[in-house]
């Protein structure tokens, strides 16, 4: 049987109550607590993939970007399948994250970075709706990366570290894509202590807008 049979089965029921004790059958890791770091890593990656899907569904992205993200979503299922099977399992996993997965992401980062403006400082997550959702997806992916590293540390012979490295590269890709989604309007730049400066200037009768974050190319 496939490692993802429980995920894709069309057979009812959709609930069994078997996990009501706080334990679950996690792939070929067997019966584990739902609070196990391996389950947490699996769940965080599932959420990360969903966050990518939201960014895609919102629209406003070029076909080249959506095509790349569609490939990423398939990779994320490879990653989830990988996490479901220990590295030292006697039978091979349905899929494993390999160096080739990382290479594809690195090439995508290099490609899309050429479409974004030069980075001259820290930028805030925002701008267009497409950019904001890509920034949000990046934050979720970074959390998933930390969760996978925790699983690698706890089970070094069972959890594939390439899965964590893939998520690291994916967060870089999402950052580059978010900046690309803002290319027409510019990045939202970080202004250190902007709120405090605005308050002080307002108290002194100065237009507070002069101290608020602005957008490159707009103000």
Residue ranges and their predicted role:
Residues 1-219:
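Phosphate/pyrophosphate-binding loop motifs in nucleotide- or prenyl diphosphate-using proteins
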């Amino acid at each position: 049987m496939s490692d993802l049979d429980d995920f894709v089965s069309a057979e009812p029921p959709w609930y069994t109550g078997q996990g009501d004790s706080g334990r679950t059958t996690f792939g070929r890791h067997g019966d584990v607590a739902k609070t196990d770091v391996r389950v947490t890593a699996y769940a965080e990656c599932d959420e990360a993939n969903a966050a990518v899907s939201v960014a895609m569904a919102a629209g406003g992205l070029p076909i080249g970007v959506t095509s790349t993200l569609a490939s990423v979503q398939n990779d994320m299922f490879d990653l989830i399948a990988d996490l479901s099977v220990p590295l030292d399992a006697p039978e091979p996993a349905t899929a494993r994250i390999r160096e080739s997965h990382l290479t594809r992401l690195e090439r995508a980062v290099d490609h899309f970075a050429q479409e974004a403006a030069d980075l001259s400082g820290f930028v805030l997550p925002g701008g267009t709706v497409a950019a904001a959702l890509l920034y949000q997806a990046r934050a979720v992916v970074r959390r998933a990366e930390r969760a996978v590293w925790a699983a690698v540390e706890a089970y070094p012979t069972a959890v594939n570290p390439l899965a964590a490295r893939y998520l690291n590269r994916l967060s870089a890709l999402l950052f580059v894509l978010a900046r690309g989604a803002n290319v027409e309007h510019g990045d939202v730049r970080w202004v250190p202590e902007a709120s405090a400066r605005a308050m002080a200037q307002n108290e002194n009768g100065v237009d507070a807008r002069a101290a608020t974050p602005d957008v490159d190319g707009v103000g």
